UniProtKB/Swiss-Prot annotation:
HAMAP family: MdoD_OpgD. Probably involved in the control of the structural glucose backbone of osmoregulated periplasmic glucans (OPGs). This is Glucans biosynthesis protein D. It comes from Salmonella paratyphi A (strain AKU_12601). Its main location: periplasm.
Length: 551
């Protein structure tokens, strides 16, 4: 497994779509899509044909890493690359009257070496035509690109694409596909946050992680006035090929993507990740080890949420551990899962550059029976906010063998809140700190004599008021140590209850402590289940250092 940076240029990219490889699978015919930039040969296209293409490709050797780019593109700095802009006058659907959506393309360059092919599809005739690269589609501004090196290189392709929605048809994008199989979307804040991927392979194994690539896209021409469009994608890597269909709904307050993928394994795969997502968690209320900045919290997502196949709701706050952690939460036909950013209060972040309070949540809703497997979560240590250190995906229980065909259907919701939530009481926040003393009586003369770690979990909603306070019973399970000084406190400002306990070690072990808690009333669960992983300090660190200077 490699530590990853979001959309990093070193991701393995596979060359799959030679001109003959794609065009030979579709017959030529006439073309009438509303695009004035599509200039390639006219070919017939449909999703069934794309599936056949991916299946045939899986029987051939992988094409390997992409070739080098012209020097003027390969040596671009991030600042220079970002200064290259697509010319909105050449947008994909500029010929569609009353269009609500439009497409622009990303330039290849810097770390984006994959030459991705783009096609415009006429939805009436099912005819497609390629859009070839040419310098006049872009504004190079101060990038310092020597465009004479690019003349006649129509096979350069593009790095990716982004989607714009009226009334911001050329100013603020709402969907972006860029780098390997990464893609993102926004809610009504127009603030990007976490990312999704087409597929994850061997994320946490003893081998090298593999990053499949989307190597070609086909865009159904959007209808006038429509805020939904369909794009198809061909995925390729050393281990697998895939045919993807995305039906993308660009709604007022959220983006919803219906995803259908058909996967064809080239070789045995140790770990396959379905509906993977990548996020960042540096510090928060529960984890402040590296929070030595002016910002109280720094994260794209604050929790993993799961709606299990048996109906149980899970809240698992994210961590920034000192050592890489991988956890697999077993399930059978999950109802949904996602990485959520539910804390939307600016004062909790104080960030006017990255606006973490505006970042969207991402919820996965399976649209078919996924069977047995696990929601897998990997957390990587990070010192700041530039590393995407959280990865989550569904891992099927059944081993993937060469020649296998798999189909997964799911829906992605990019929104401030997930589309569903538990009817029970929900975890609002998790806080940790010094323990070993009665709440409200932290001693001022000296630190507590015995070391302990305090946990405070805030619950809101559900039937808490009907049960509270005497009938609320916290059910706490620990993999090691003891929970003492358990308290149930009503918190008027958020009209909920805080469950507080101190964790005391019973051994010198520094192994992670798995914690589990839910609230019960008269034998029935009245809250979702809180899961947490705590990392005890070494025995010689289990003391409080008094650094006061008394004169």
């Amino acid at each position: 497994m490699n530590r990853r940076r979001f959309i990093k240029g070193s991701m393995a990219m596979a060359a799959v779509c030679g001109s003959s490889g794609i065009a030979s699978l579709f017959s030529q015919a006439a073309f009438a899509a509303e695009s004035d930039i599509a200039d390639g040969k006219i070919v017939r296209f449909d999703f069934a044909g794309l599936q056949s293409m991916a299946q045939a490709l899986a029987k051939k050797p992988w094409g390997g890493a992409p070739g080098p780019l012209p020097d003027t593109l390969a040596n671009l700095t991030p600042q220079a690359y970002n200064s290259i802009q697509y010319d909105a006058a050449h947008s994909l659907w500029n010929g569609v009257a009353n269009r609500q959506l439009d497409i622009q393309f990303f330039h290849v360059g810097m770390g984006f070496r994959r030459r991705v092919r783009m096609f415009s599809v006429d939805t009436t005739t099912h005819l497609a035509r390629e859009i070839h690269f040419r310098p006049e589609l872009f504004k190079y501004n101060d990038a310092g690109v020597d465009t004479t090196q690019l003349e006649g290189q129509s096979d350069l392709g593009f790095a990716g694409f982004r989607v714009f929605k009226a009334p911001e048809l050329a100013r603020r994008d709402v969907v972006s596909f860029l780098g390997a199989s990464y893609f993102r979307a926004v809610d009504d804040t127009y603030q990007y946050g976490l990312s999704a991927r087409g597929l994850a392979i061997d994320t946490y194994t003893d081998g090298q992680e593999e990053f499949p690539d989307f190597t070609a896209f086909w865009f159904d021409t959007a209808k006038p006035g429509d805020t939904t469009f369909t794009v198809y994608a061909l995925l390729d890597s050393a281990s697998v090929t895939g045919a993807y269909k995305f039906v993308i709904h660009c709604e007022k307050t959220q983006v919803i993507m219906d995803v259908e993928n058909h996967l064809y394994a080239r070789k045995d795969i140790k770990q396959l990740g379905i509906a993977p997502m990548t996020s960042m968690f540096s510090c928060g209320n529960n984890e402040r080890r590296v929070c030595d900045t002016i910002h109280p919290q720094i994260h794209d997502s604050d929790r993993l949420a799961m709606w299990r196949g048996n109906g149980e709701w899970i809240c698992r706050p994210l961590n920034n551990p000192q050592k890489l952690q991988f956890n697999a939460y077993m399930d059978d036909n999950p109802k949904g899962f996602g990485l959520l950013q539910l804390d939307r209060d600016f004062s909790h972040y104080q960030d006017v550059m990255d606006w973490y309070n505006k970042r969207p949540s991402l919820w996965v809703e399976p649209r078919s029976k996924w069977g047995k497997g696990a929601v897998s979560l990997m957390e990587i240590p990070t010192t700041g906010e530039t590393l995407d250190n959280v990865v989550c995906f569904w891992q099927p229980e059944k081993a993937i063998k060469a020649g296998d065909t798999l189909v997964f259907n799911y829906r992605l919701y990019w929104s401030a809140q997930p589309p569903v939530q538990s009817p029970l009481a929900r975890v609002m926040a998790t806080r940790t700190g010094m323990g070993g003393f009665p709440e409200g009586w932290a001693p001022g003369e000296h630190y507590p004599d015995k070391w302990a770690r305090r946990f405070a979990i805030d619950f809101v909603g559900g039937d808490l008021k009907a049960a509270a306070p005497k009938s609320i019973e916290p059910v706490i399970t620990l993999s090691s140590g003891e929970a003492k000084q358990v308290e149930i406190l009503y918190v008027e400002p958020f009209d909920g209850y805080r469950i507080q306990f101190d964790w005391y070690p019973t051994s010198d072990s520094t192994a992670p402590v798995d914690m589990r808690m839910f609230l019960r009333c008269q034998g029935e669960a009245i809250s979702e289940t809180w899961l947490y992983q705590y990392f005890p300090p070494a025995p010689d660190k289990r003391r409080y250092v008094d650094d006061r200077i008394m004169r």
